[in-house]
């Protein structure tokens, strides 16, 4: 690998585009079309995308979110939830608060997708407790599980911000299913019940965090926009659960709770879409809207249209100088058109590379699950009684594990190369005076500096070892002579005699001194 890396700067732009084409070819089929990692249940080509239909009765979005009586149309809120014109504060930043909002009507969608935009903000570095997005058979208006009821029948996607088990794996996003008979393991953050999870920090972000949850062909996929950029479509893969069975009819909901620590949990929008598989006839909106509602909506539309026409006339009367703008200002120039086309092309390349990055994340997640399952199988068989004729299957499992690890390594290398490609494309999107020649010259300078450092190290090594002679240890100093036994005994006897004589002399002096008193 070291040889190929030194040749990359010399190849210049040609090697870069060859690597880009090779990376694209690894993830395309025989017909030249690639899969869509962001699409729900993407197993085919991009042409086989499901039909999306917006369901307004299972959605809310600001502005003008609440009615005059403080309620949200088609939704019911409970607990400490506070609806406002632009958002719904599910749980305020006070201790021991919990609230929730739920759809009033049950949804009977075979496949669906929800897009939730929310903010979790707090003053401290650690927050609590978190927020949950639900699809359950019944409404859980109040309860101990992030403000909702326990033993639910359905699925919950938990945005857990507090580390209850002390494993330092929070904030985390956890997918937990329930059949209505299991109590949530709150002390361990549901680690033993999690179907899938990922670690993402969703607190105190500069932009709202977005979650896209897709249930398509019995596969639940969670995509996250971490809120670092204003791009609404900048999603990354988080979790995926296959062969998941949920109730055919259920309520959508979102809940939140606080504990000793408290965050503000605000939901800006909750958009629901019904998905229809390709080849099937999409549902028509006329079947759901009655004639009275149609007439009512038509009257409202005509009323708003008349008000708009009046506002236009008033604006034109108040601003006569803005009428009759030159036609040249309306159309773009040739330079503007060319610049727009260049940026659009570069943006498409950037989006394709990000799509490949998402697909690599999904492949890595699947490979990790396969490796973990095989490792558990190996450990379970290894814990059995020895001497059984199962060594052949053990070797096969070891071979499969090694091959899976090799695949993971190769996928990581491809991902790293794609990240480098994204960096180079980002550099191309900012054109300046530096070209391909200057970039190549920069790499050549780095290579030359590395050679100089290596030469200096070699010279230092040769200078420290001028010959092949082995290093000798220094000679030991002369051992000091010890005192003999006779001298030691004489010294002790003399010292004892002197001590006894001193005691006797002192006693006589004290006795003589007492005669004078």
UniProtKB/Swiss-Prot annotation:
The modification Phosphoserine is found at residue 433. Ca(2+) binds at residues 160, 162, 164, 189. Residues 52-275 form the L-type lectin-like domain. One of its GO terms (cellular component) is endoplasmic reticulum-Golgi intermediate compartment. Residues 506-517 are annotated as: Mediates interaction with RAB3GAP1, RAB3GAP2 and UBXN6. Residues 31-484 are lumenal. One of its GO terms (biological process) is protein transport. It holds the Pfam family Lectin_leg-like. Disulfide bonds join 198-238. It is found in: Endoplasmic reticulum-Golgi intermediate compartment membrane; Golgi apparatus membrane; Endoplasmic reticulum membrane. Residues 1-30 form the signal peptide. Residues 506-517 are cytoplasmic. Exists both as a covalent disulfide-linked homohexamer, and a complex of three disulfide-linked dimers non-covalently kept together. Interacts with MCFD2. May interact with TMEM115. Interacts with RAB3GAP1 and RAB3GAP2. Interacts with UBXN6. Interacts with SERPINA1/alpha1-antitrypsin. Interacts with BET1. The FF ER export motif at the C-terminus is not sufficient to support endoplasmic reticulum exit, and needs assistance of Gln-508 for proper recognition of COPII coat components. Mannose-specific lectin. May recognize sugar residues of glycoproteins, glycolipids, or glycosylphosphatidyl inositol anchors and may be involved in the sorting or recycling of proteins, lipids, or both. The LMAN1-MCFD2 complex forms a specific cargo receptor for the ER-to-Golgi transport of selected proteins. This is Protein ERGIC-53. It comes from Mus musculus (Mouse). The lineage of its organism: Eukaryota, Metazoa, Chordata, Craniata, Vertebrata. The gene is Lman1.
């Amino acid at each position: 690998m070291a040889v190929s890396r030194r040749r990359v700067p010399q190849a210049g732009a040609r090697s870069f585009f060859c690597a880009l084409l090779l990376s694209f070819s690894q993830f395309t089929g025989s017909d030249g079309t690639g899969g869509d990692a962001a699409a729900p249940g993407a197993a085919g080509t991009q042409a086989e995308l499901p039909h999306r239909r917006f369901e307004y009765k299972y959605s809310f979005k600001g502005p003008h979110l609440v009615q005059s009586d403080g309620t949200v149309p088609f939704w019911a809120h409970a607990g400490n939830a506070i609806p406002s014109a632009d958002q719904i504060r599910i749980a305020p930043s006070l201790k021991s608060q919990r609230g929730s909002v739920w759809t009033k009507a049950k949804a009977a969608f075979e496949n669906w997708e929800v897009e939730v935009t929310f903010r979790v903000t707090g003053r401290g570095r650690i927050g609590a407790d978190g927020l949950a997005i639900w699809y359950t058979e019944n409404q859980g208006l109040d309860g101990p599980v992030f403000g909702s009821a326990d033993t639910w029948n359905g699925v919950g996607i938990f945005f857990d911000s507090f580390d209850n088990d002390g494993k330092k794996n929070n904030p985390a996003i956890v997918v937990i299913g329930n059949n209505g008979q299991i109590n949530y393991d709150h002390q361990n953050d549901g680690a033993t019940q999690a179907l899938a999870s990922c670690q993402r920090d969703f607190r105190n972000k500069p932009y709202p965090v977005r979650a896209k949850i897709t249930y398509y062909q019995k596969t639940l996929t969670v995509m996250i926009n971490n809120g670092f950029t204003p791009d609404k479509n900048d999603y990354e893969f988080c979790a995926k659960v296959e062969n998941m069975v949920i109730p055919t009819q259920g309520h959508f909901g979102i809940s939140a709770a606080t504990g000793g620590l408290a965050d503000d949990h605000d939901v800006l929008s909750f958009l629901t879409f019904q998905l229809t598989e390709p080849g099937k006839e999409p549902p028509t909106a006329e079947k759901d809207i009655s004639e009275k509602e149609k007439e009512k909506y038509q009257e409202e539309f005509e009323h708003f249209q008349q008000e708009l026409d009046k506002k236009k006339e008033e604006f034109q009367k108040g601003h006569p100088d803005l009428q009759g703008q030159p036609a040249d200002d309306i159309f773009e120039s040739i330079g503007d058109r060319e610049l727009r086309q260049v940026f659009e092309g570069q943006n498409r390349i950037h989006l394709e590379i990000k799509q490949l990055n998402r697909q690599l994340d999904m492949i890595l997640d699947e490979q990790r699950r396969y490796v973990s399952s095989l490792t558990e199988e190996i450990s379970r068989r290894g814990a059995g009684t020895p001497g059984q004729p199962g060594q052949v299957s053990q070797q096969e499992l070891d071979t499969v594990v090694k091959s899976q690890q090799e695949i993971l390594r190769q996928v990581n290398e491809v991902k790293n190369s794609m990240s480098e490609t994204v960096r180079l494309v980002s550099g191309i999107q900012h054109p300046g005076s530096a070209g391909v020649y200057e970039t190549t010259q920069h790499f050549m300078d780095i290579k030359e500096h590395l050679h100089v450092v290596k030469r200096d190290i070699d010279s230092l090594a040769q200078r420290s070892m001028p010959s092949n002679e082995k290093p000798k240890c220094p000679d030991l100093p002369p051992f000091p002579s010890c005192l003999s036994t006779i001298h030691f005994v004489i010294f002790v006897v003399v010292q004892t005699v002197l001590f006894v004589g001193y005691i006797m002399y002192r006693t006589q002096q004290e006795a003589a001194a007492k005669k004078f008193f």
